[in-house]
Amino acid sequence: MKKTLLLCAFLVGLVSSNVMALTLDEARTQGRVGETFYGYLVALKTDAETEKLVADINAERKASYQQLAKQNNVSVDDIVKLAGQKLVARAKPGEYVQGINGKWVRKF
């Protein structure tokens, strides 16, 4: 339960603290990025702005995953899997997620 609350707080912080030229919400709604079950964002469009956003977000996520794992005495893989499940589950209709078969699908 504690892990879940910490993870939810982390995920909310990622979205709200991201002040970049291209925001994560914009990239999601424009179909430029997609969420994966392994907890990281993937660029679906290969322009420099999208790739920079993805690299920055993923670096923040990696650091947060490592910190959460250490605080909760669990493996980083456990945190990554939980984060991935939650990120895919909370994706809004029209946003891209990677299915368990590896194919990109638009949520509806």
Predicted regions and their residues:
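Amphipathic, charged alpha-helical segments and their helix-to-coil junctions
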Residues: L22-D56, V76-F108
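Generic anion/oxyanion-binding catalytic loop in active/binding sites
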Residues: F10, T50, L68
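Sec/Tat signal peptide C-region and signal peptidase I cleavage site
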Residues: S16-A21
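Sec-dependent N-terminal signal peptides
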Residues: L5-G13
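N-terminal hydrophobic targeting signals that begin at the initiator methionine
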Residues: M1-K2
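Short, well-ordered alpha-helical segments
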Residues: L53-A69
